[in-house]
Amino acid sequence: RIASDIKADDNGAWAKLLGNWGHASGNDNATGYQTSTYGVLLGLDGELFDDGRLGVMTGYTRTSLDGGYQSDAHSDNYHLGLYGNKRFGALALRAGGTYTWHRIDTSRSVNYGAQSDREKASYNARTGQLFIESGYDWTNDTVNLEPFANLAYTHYRNEGINEHGGAAALRGDKQSQSATASTLGLRADTQWQADSVAIALRGELGWQHQYGKLERKTQLMFKRTDAAFDVNSVPVSRDGAVLKAGVDVAVNKNAVLSLGYGGQLSSNHQDNSVNAGMTWRF
């Protein structure tokens, strides 16, 4: 989500605190899970050429996952990104990408007969994200509207998994997975002046479509054998809704405080996030 949530708007530096929580429903093959993420993102962007801007960002987030049945995972995530836009009158073209390094720790309990094991693993992984987007401004005296189309590609690769703890420990070689999603939607914002403070309200409603296979597959094997088998995740939903809402408060000519909510809702997954940020223009 990070790559498609950033775009260059004004000359300045910005900081954003974020929190995210999600739920995935299980099926006959895999149990559901709960996730939570918190962290901070920092960025700097400015004008590069006429009606064009470029920005860089970095940040740290930590994700926790509870899979039930005494299984959990934690991931420390380090982000680096580049993004920008170019305007042609009312038409805006945006693009960007991020690269994330993960340090993942997993733990699960295995109970069979009189045996009880606690299997643990620590491994590294990487995620690359790219997005392109176009939007068209429709402005009147009351509200600004922007229909938009967004296409995002995500590629994930782990550096191998090697559990330890008992006879049921698993291992896996380096593996990668990819996903592509498009979003069609409408953004709206309006603003007014309250005494010496400028206030803006913004919202977004979109339809997101996932391409390709909906299940993510990992090939694993028991540590003492070479017989591999596939483990499938809970499938993502083919289609879902994207919701966003926020408020920006310009406390002076240089500083803007923001508070926002984002949600992705589908039949199998519910994902919610809140963020608070500050932009300092120069």
Where are these regions (language model features)?
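Solvent-exposed flexible segments
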Residues: 134, 145, 150-156
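Solvent-exposed, glycine/polar-rich loop segments of beta-barrel outer-membrane systems
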Residues: 27-36, 68-71, 103-124, 155-178, ...
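Outer membrane beta-barrel transmembrane domains
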Residues: 164, 168-282
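Beta-strand segments within the central parallel beta-sheet cores of soluble alpha/beta enzyme folds
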Residues: 58, 96, 146-149, 200-204
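Outer membrane beta-barrel translocator domains of Type V secretion systems
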Residues: 1-141, 258-262, 266-282
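Flexible loop/turn segments at secondary-structure boundaries
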Residues: 22-24, 63-65, 154-157, 208-212, ...
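Short secondary-structure transition/capping segments
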Residues: 97-111, 147, 235-252
